């Protein structure tokens, strides 16, 4: 699916971070709901670790009594459902791609290529946007240069340059595609308390440490479950009470609230009206320190 012009006019939120961000989920102190994790299906964990650890610079950690391997990046964890071949990549789903910001985009793009991964910037931006050596320059004055990489098993990753950023990499955004993108933005604002933002190339909503971007899609999109990015995750304070509120608002829990002693956290799942599978957690900010 070729993205619309709204995607490629990336006047994206430049997330403010500090040098303490390496402690993971530091944004959790800034609000009752923050972004928590990406959860990938994979049949090739080594390849995923080569991309997210060796290339992007994440830290491989083990959590819980089962020593679950997780990649830690500033303000996001990446979990893996291993030995689970995805049914497709992220493109074509409600979550088209995930984004990270870096202070030196040229350096990161060169590293992605040197490690054997494909850059797909040319096919992911508008035909009239100049791409030089796999980097698309700012779409407008004051905008950011961007690039797109294809991680293993079809996970599309956007890299956004933020030259003022003090750390090597941090989570930047989750980018949703939907023919009803404005309605989708409103749902995330209402459900998770994200702060609505308009006036850019596409509707957006902000939570501490991350932007949720919503581009229109000319083509139908499918649910995330089973695809390379199986679900997204939000870290929620007082999760049990939050789940009761969701149910009172008519949102059905796909997986009811429960505690996971092996990880020292609590979880619940919902699905948004367009098929995005969403895990809600409480405690990831502690177990990942």
Give residue spans per PLM region.
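Mid-chain, structured segments of secreted extracytoplasmic proteins
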Residues: 65-117
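Vicinal oxygen chelate
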Residues: 22-31, 109, 113-176, 197-207, ...
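Mature N-terminal segment immediately following signal peptide/propeptide cleavage
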Residues: 29-65, 69-70
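Short, surface-exposed ligand-recognition loops at beta-strand->loop->(often short) alpha-helix junctions
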Residues: 39-44, 100-102, 176-182, 235-237
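Eukaryotic phosphotyrosine signaling hubs
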Residues: 35, 94-97, 228-231
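Bacterial N-terminal signal peptides
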Residues: 6-20
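Amphipathic alpha-helical segments
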Residues: 43-60, 108-115, 180-196, 248-249
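N-terminal secretory signal peptides that target proteins for export/translocation
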Residues: 1-2
